[in-house]
Amino acid sequence: MKAFAVLVVPLLLTSPAWGQSELKTPPTSTRSTAPAPTGIHAALTVEGHVLVGDVAPDFDLTSSRDRQVRLSRQRGDWVLLVFVPDRDGFSDYSTVNHDLAAIGVRLLGVCRDNPQTLRTVAEKNGIPFEMLADATGEISSMYGFYDGARRCCIPGFLVLDRRGVVKLAVSGQVVPASQVLSLTSLTVAAP
C-alpha cells in the first residue's frame, strides 16, 4: 500500500502541471466571411438600432418639398417615421395621412432616393406628406433600417412621442398603412 501511495502521489502532483504546459490551439471558426464592402458602404454594414424607450437620433434630410427637415425640430408633435425599400412604398400612406393628422401625428417617410426624384413622385402621385431623401442610406442604417448587402432600406416604422422618445418600433416587414394607423392610434392613446 505504501508503494502504491508513493507512485500515485507524484503522478497526481505532476499531472496538473503537465496539463497546463500542453499547447492548446484555438478552435477553428466554421463561419465564412464575405468580402468587406468598400467606400461609403463599408461604414453602413454596421447597423445601428433604436429601441422602444430610446430618444430617436437626430438627423437632417432634404424632403420632397425641397426643404431641410431636422427630426429634433418636430418635437412637440407625435411623429410616425416610416422606412420603405423604395418610393413606391409611400403611396399606401396617402390614404391615412389625414387620419394621422387628426390624432396629432405627423407622417415622415424615409427612403434611399434623391430629393428631386421624391419631389417628382410627390407631385405626380399627390403624396400629401414629406418624403425624406436618405440617398446614402446613412440615416436608415443609424436606425437599423438598412440592408448593406442589398443597399436598400428595410421596411418598418417608428412612432415617436412629443419628446422624441420611441414608443413603438416595427422592423423587417411591410405593414399595410391601415394597420400602421391603428397601431399608431393605440400608441398615441396609451397613458
Protein language model annotation of sequence segments:
Residues A5-S15:
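Bacterial N-terminal signal peptides
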Residues L23-L71:
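N-terminal "domain-start" segment that seeds a small globular fold
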Residues V69-Y93:
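Short active-site neighborhood of thiol/selenol oxidoreductases, capturing the structured segment around
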Residues S72-Q74, F145, G172:
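Residue-level structural signal for beta-strand termini and adjacent loop
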Residues R87-E130, G137-S141:
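Structural microenvironment flanking redox-active thiols in thiol-disulfide oxidoreductases
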Residues P128-F129, F145-L158:
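Structural micro-motif
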Residues C153-P191:
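Thiol-/selenol-based redox modules, centered on thioredoxin-like
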